[in-house]
Structures are given as C-alpha cells and as structure tokens.
Amino acid sequence: VHLTPEEKAAVTALWGKVNVDEVGGEALGRLLVVYPWTQRFFESFGDLSSPDAVMGNPKVKAHGKKVLGAFSDGLAHLDNLKGTFAQLSELHCDKLHVDPENFRLLGNVLVCVLAHHFGKEFTPQVQAAYQKVVAGVANALAHKYH
C-alpha cells in the first residue's frame, strides 16, 4: 500500500487510540448483521439469530479481537502486506473457502466503525488513508485466490 508520510502518520496516530477488543467485536458483528450471508462461516459461534444476539455474542467479540489483532500486525508492515497475510490468505482460501469479497466488506465496515467511534477526528483525509489500508489488506488476504 502506498501511503504518503502524512497518511501513514494519520493512520498510525488514530490506530494508537483504537480499543481493539471493542472495535474488533463491533466490526465483525456489524459485518454479520449487515451482510447476513457471511454468517455461514461462523455457524459454530452459536446464536446469531438477531442483531442483538450477534452483537452480544462472546465468540463474535473474541474473533473480532483476533481479526483486529491481525490488522494491527498489517499496519506495522504496510510495505509487505502480502507477506504479512500470506498464511491467513492460505487459511481462508484453502481451508475455510471464504469468498474474498468478504474481506473488502469487512474493511468497509471497519471504516464505518472507526468513523462512529472517532467522529470529527475521523476526517475525510483520515478516511481516505484508511480506505487505502483496508483495500490493501483485503487484496493481500485475497492473494492466495489468484
């Protein structure tokens, strides 16, 4: 992902304020509510029968935290996202058979959650930088599919 020094600074500064536990669970939960067909990958998580059930599900929250932990690793290696996410790409492609479009959807949901949490601090410039990052991460996760 090519970011200007200003974009990189904006992404890093905001990410330092992110509560990974909270934002991860909310982002994954919103993905499952807004795009209900993604729930088929999480059938082992128990009750996903309503938006409240999804958002309150401890397994959704725990996996969201794990997902955002991996995203944090990616932020530390923006120059090598394909390498950073190679194993996760292989897992999601070969073993889990996740539609790579879901990575793009989750990235966009994450941007929405960050905007919700940070309000005016999440300026259009910050959003533009994050859109580049989530697109780069989605492409890296989809790399094994190509």
UniProtKB/Swiss-Prot annotation:
Modified residues (Phosphothreonine): T12
N6-acetyllysine carried by residues: K59, K82, K144
Top-level taxon in the UniProt lineage: Eukaryota
Intrachain disulfide bonds: none
Keyword terms: Acetylation, Heme, Iron, Metal-binding, Oxygen transport, Phosphoprotein, S-nitrosylation, Transport
Expression tissues: Red blood cells.
Domain (Globin) ranges: 2-146
Residues the record lists as binding heme b: H63, H92
Residues where Phosphoserine is found: S44
An example Gene Ontology biological process: hydrogen peroxide catabolic process
Modified sites of kind N-acetylvaline: V1
Residues bearing PTM S-nitrosocysteine: C93
Classification via SUPFAM superfamilies: Globin-like
InterPro entries assigned: Globin (IPR000971), Globin-like_sf (IPR009050), Globin/Proto (IPR012292), Hemoglobin_b (IPR002337), Hemoglobin_oxygen_transport (IPR050056)
GO CC terms in record: blood microparticle; haptoglobin-hemoglobin complex; hemoglobin complex
Pfam families, A to Z: Globin
GO molecular function: haptoglobin binding; heme binding; hemoglobin alpha binding; metal ion binding; organic acid binding; oxygen binding; oxygen carrier activity; peroxidase activity
Biological role stated in the UniProt entry: Involved in oxygen transport from the lung to the various peripheral tissues.
Subunit and partners: Heterotetramer of two alpha chains and two beta chains.
Family membership noted in the UniProt record: Belongs to the globin family.
Record protein name field: Hemoglobin subunit beta
Organism in which the protein naturally occurs: Semnopithecus entellus
Gene from which the chain derives: HBB
